């Protein structure tokens, strides 16, 4: 049974489309990964789900409730942790959690018990009674997660919860999310970290340019690709012209299914091949054209390969493309709507 149903969502900011016919179903009790580059529409989707933003069209159903018609009812079962941490720098972490508990009308004894439990689970004992203005980014993120969990939500929505964090804070958050998943909490986790979604998610969707382009378990998506992945270089850094020349040479090699130029990695070539037996053919074709292999690495399919198969570019290439198009002022205006 699906706890979340997003049907044909459309959303634009002025003339710029953010979501285009986005449809998604998240099973109850599942840790569901939402993977895509910055600017793909992840935050817009989560803000609509959290009843903080209205779509131009489409339906949002949470636990059988129409979130657009009854947002108050949905908010009672939902915990939302936004990408941008917003905390009062004057309060201590404990005081902020107490305030959050009061806003949820939790009885004082229950509120304090939950606060103590979250302090323990998120390893905040050493600094929880210091003012929030003294906290590091990892401390603030853990506190923000604790605030989102204080009312024991049935559904937890997380927007890039570990972006920019130190390894210790990331490990703590991963452990908590795995425990919540085991206890039956439904979690929608937005991320552009491939390894995070691969490690944590039971099911996932990949989003690009406001559309869901792939959906399933991480293993299903990787296995569906078939073949081995080969990363090839003829020198440490090639240019676009040389990379295209090599691609054209290798396209005709028997057993080579697909070749994509990875601009973000010095114009290396990402190949999909039928197996080990194809590698000598690749090396021979290069040698016949007076080209030597600088480096060659073979691996099984990854989530980046899934993204590459669906879009023709790697996730890092997509990140770089978005970074070059960004308008910080426009992004701030959009986030305030």
Task: Indicate where each model-derived feature is located.
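ABC transporter nucleotide-binding domains
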Residues: 2-214
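Solvent-exposed beta-strand sheet faces enriched in polar/charged residues
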Residues: 7, 233, 262, 297-299
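Short phosphate-engaging motifs
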Residues: 18, 196, 239-242, 278, ...
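Short, surface-exposed acidic/glycine-rich loop or hinge patches that mediate macromolecular interfaces
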Residues: 65-68, 212, 237, 276, ...
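A generic structural signal for secondary-structure junctions
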Residues: 79, 105, 144, 226, ...
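ABC transporter nucleotide-binding domain
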Residues: 175-273
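C-terminal coupling/interaction segments
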Residues: 274-337
